[in-house]
Amino acid sequence: MSIEQLKDQIPDFAKDVRLNLSSMASDETLSPQAKYGLFVACAIATRNPMVMAAFEAVAAAQLSATALAAAKSAAAIMAMNNVYYRFVHLASNKEYATMPARLRMNVIANPGVDKADFELWSLAVSAINGCGTCIDAHEKVLQEAAVPAASIQTAVRFAAIIQSVAVAIEAAGVTVALAAE
């Protein structure tokens, strides 16, 4: 499935989402690896099979096998870290913040691709998953790596668009299912 075919699945009530998807696809703010890896990581974070399939198909033609695997790794490791660190942050009992996480996360130190790209993907997935602690940590690493604020903002904007595509498609499916009853 292509992005154009995915766009065709977005219902009219989400016209803005469709337009944002078109704009995102043609945006050249990020390098190709950063952009297409971000597409994959964020699509996985939506948990929508149609969105995942479309973005992986588009990205596979643009990314090396190593970069594609790293983007998937970013989504997987953030799925774990975002839950854990969001809990630590939100729990009233601050003792948890002093305890070792005891979670393996070696891929963050050695992602197999440019570290800034991996951090950008991790930040975007953390935005989708709503982990403020992870957002702050990844944004700090990106600032230290001299990644421009415009690139960071673009990554989060893309995450928001990809998430909205998944929600619009799911909402359309519910509408169709209810109409059939």
Curated annotation (Swiss-Prot):
Entry-linked InterPro entries: AhpD, AhpD-like, AhpD_core, CMD-like
Xref: Gene3D superfamilies: AhpD-like (1.20.1290.10)
A GO BP annotation: response to oxidative stress
Keywords carried by this UniProt record: Antioxidant, Disulfide bond, Oxidoreductase, Peroxidase, Redox-active center
Cystine residue pairs: C131-C134
Broad enzyme group: oxidoreductase
The protein's Enzyme Commission number: 1.11.1.28
One Pfam family of this chain: CMD
Keyword Thylakoid: no
Catalytic activity: N(6)-[(R)-dihydrolipoyl]-L-lysyl-[lipoyl-carrier protein] + a hydroperoxide = N(6)-[(R)-lipoyl]-L-lysyl-[lipoyl-carrier protein] + an alcohol + H2O
Residues at the active site: C131 (proton donor), C134 (cysteine sulfenic acid (-soh) intermediate)
UniProt GO MF annotations: alkyl hydroperoxide reductase activity; disulfide oxidoreductase activity; hydroperoxide reductase activity; peroxiredoxin activity
Protein purpose: Antioxidant protein with alkyl hydroperoxidase activity. Required for the reduction of the AhpC active site cysteine residues and for the regeneration of the AhpC enzyme activity.
Family to which the UniProt record says this protein belongs: Belongs to the AhpD family.
Protein name, UniProt field: Alkyl hydroperoxide reductase AhpD
Organism: Bradyrhizobium sp. (strain ORS 278)
